[in-house]
Amino acid sequence: YKYKNANYGIGKIKRHWSFSPRTSLILSNNARPSTSIYFDIKGSKSDGYPLPWINRWSLEGFNSFLSNTNNPKNAMLMGLRMVIQPINNFKFELIKTSQWGGVGYASDLSALQASLLGNTNENRNKNINQMAGFGLSYKTIINKLPIRLYSQSIGEDEVGYLPNCYMHIIGSEIGELSSKFISKFGLEYVDTRIDLSSNGNCGPGTSYNNNTYKYTNYDRSLGAAIDGDSKLIMLRGSTALSKNMNINYSIGKVIINNYNNPRHRLSNAREKGLLSTLATTWDLNSLKLNGKITYQNFGLNESTKGLGLTFSAKYTF
């Protein structure tokens, strides 16, 4: 349902909450989307505010049911994201998610309020798992080259209603280096390791876990694909060979399960190595074809080292 500059609905929506084109620490395409009730609102010039930046904002929210092996049945995920553009070429995001409810846990108005605003480290709503943080994106031109810098920091715990125990993304992009092809090249660093805080909280095993909920859907991380206690540095690029054909390529060095946790979802032991990809997309009007070749020189619980190939086709009637 659409009303003015707002949309409301129910459905399975893929969400990628990050200024990084590849990675989000809090909500990404790594896990399958779940059915949610949602809204999104965007600022408009017709709002009539005298300062232009007040009109350049968006707000998105949802509440969905998760499906996992180890989480309480019918546990829910609530999310809110606000993006503001105070000046040209600079964007700022505030993000928050809460896992709450499920069989055996409160899902009443008190729990709803705590999921939105409350301190959930104590009392009857201490089961609620909250994550929150912020992100930045800034674009500029240096020597005729368009350059974008971005970052995201997400806290896995709260102290005095504010996020604490952070994971981080930092990255950059350079675009359009050729007059013949439109290309982008980027460098990105992702770190989901969390150190011990000054009061002895957090530390290894904290990211994407708490005592009640695992931050997953269908047992895959809702955030970064490398899951918790891991890090990745990746060089990537994309080239539009034509209006209908794109090529994406990347190579990265990754460490999975840095602290050798035997209960890590991706690997029972620490693994490190190289990961490279080459992907193509053909958009032929109603038919869309995707192909991807991957290579990794390390093994994980559900993937072996070596070459991998995937192919998909989508036809729209």
Please give the residue ranges for each predicted region.
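Exposed, low-structure sequence patches enriched in small/polar residues
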Residues: 90-98, 102-317
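Outer-membrane beta-barrel channel domains
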Residues: 1-86, 182-189, 206, 211-229, ...
